[in-house]
Amino acid sequence: MRKWLIGLLLILGLCAGFAQAETYVVAVDGTGDFQTLTEAAAASSTGDTILLRTGVYGEQETFPIALDHAVTIEGEDGAVLDSPRFKTMVSVTADGVTLRNIRFQVRKWGIVADVSRAMTVEDCEFVLGDEECRTSSTAIWLRGMKDCAIRRCTFRQVGICIAGDPLSDKSAGKTVLTGMCEAGEDPEYFSTHEIADCTINGRPYYYFVGQDNLTVPTDAGGLIAVECDNLTVRDIDVSDSSMGLEIARSRNVTLENVSADRCGIFGTYLVFVQGAVLRNVHVEQTNHGIDIRGSQNVVVTDSLALNCDQGVFFTHCTDCTLQDSHVQGCGFGYFGAVGNGNRIGNCTFSDNADGIYLQNEPNATITACDVRQSRVTGLRILKSSCVCTDTTVADGWTGVIYYDSHDTTIENCDFSDNASANMYLGNGRGATIRNCRFSGETKAHLEVEGTQTDMLVTQCTFTGSRADMLKAASHTLPTFTDCAWSTPGVFWTGKEWNGSTDGDAPNRNCDIVQIGREAPRADSVPYDTPEQAIDGAVNYRKENSGRYLLLSQTNWTFRLFD
């Protein structure tokens, strides 16, 4: 009898559980249970269903609409979610969420699914709602998501992006998508989904997992390929998407004759790839044109990046190469970070903010490149080491910035007509600048700041006056050997002051000679001869060791600066 009662109670409990599932109706005109999806989602519980009647759900909603429990949202034909600009529409943080038959007017991110499982998206339409919001917009972000099913959906100018967990204090040292999420350390973030019967811009949206020796059909409008060996992608156009193509955890990949223009996130994205050749890849007006992360032995050749927010990215890459390619009109032409042994050869960079930017990038090689018209810096070397040879950096703002870097050789290069400075050295150590030519219209061939340790400039030629073209706010200078100046001019470093701490001379070696750096202080003192100027400088520095001295060759006036 007792067992029978227990069984009956279990059955009644199950029935009660099923009975608790509710169906709510949302209607803009007030004929449903709620007028907004925001309210319905907040009122619903696990297992409930929300029916979204025909209408546009926009200004009245609070975005993002949070789905933190398993709920099904199903729209009637004509049910539209329309978010404001730069707003995420739906945030999913629970397992088992279903969205069906809804049109998303995307102006940033449509659905963002974070660290959850088993989301289902069926029969939905995702459309870029505003051309001005294209950059960084995407229909579906899967961030740390597993077992997602996306079926019979249509995408126009936005697509699907797959990555790892949102950034946290555990992300340090991992490959990341800067400011957004980790690239995805867990293979299941990429491989456990179902993307079926979907189209993008009227063409098939392909998702392949574990298919070796695959050649992707040329009718592809979008591509996600995971754990494929000997993958060939040839003669396809994946433009007008979020990520035109995403290839993850694959080996021996060939991309050839691929276009990925006007993509909001990345045009061509390779992550955790072992061995690839990208040939004749064209990216234009895309956020990140060619983006390679966490990969080894990737070669990008004969490719073109035009007017992208960022041109070519190599981050956390090893032994990768960019060669015989052109990057123009981008933010960073090439950005390399936290990799090792990567190479740039025979490339041209023009009219970018930074032509080449190395950050925390050891053992890089730059050979036979032409970098011109950089709006900020032609070659920026930050906390990195490299060998740069046979390269021209010209017609920009600052030619080279070498800052807080080490163990670098710059040899047989030309630096000319960079308006602010042909080369800036800040806190450098262990660099050799050999057999280079500095010329053209510029405020300085070399501008030096901070501490210089084991820095050598040798066998270089400089046009103009040494007093004009070497400028510094530094206590130490590189060592110059066998260099030639068109006009030697006056240059004096006061070496007798080095290391003096006895009170008879300044404690720091921070005097430098130059002309016309900026307006002098009102108390500048004129002298009639160089000898008088030097004597005056010595006496002044004994009393004012915290100031810089700058000597005008024109009238032998020491200009005093705090």
Briefly describe each language-model feature range.
Residues T23-G58, I515-R559:
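Acidic Gly/Asp/Thr-rich repetitive segments characteristic of extracellular carbohydrate-active
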Residues G7-C15:
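Bacterial N-terminal signal peptides
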Residues T49, G58-L81, V92-R100, T192-P204, ...:
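Beta-solenoid repeat scaffold
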Residues M1-W4:
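Positively charged n-region of N-terminal signal peptides that target proteins for export
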Residues Q35-A43, G58-D68, V90, I195-D197, ...:
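Short, T/G/N/S-enriched strand-turn elements that build extracellular solenoid repeat scaffolds
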Residues G17-A21:
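Sec/Tat signal peptide C-region and signal peptidase I cleavage site
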Residues F86, N101, V106-M145, R151-A183, ...:
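Extracellular beta-rich repeat passengers
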Residues F208-D229:
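Short, surface-exposed, low-complexity cationic segments
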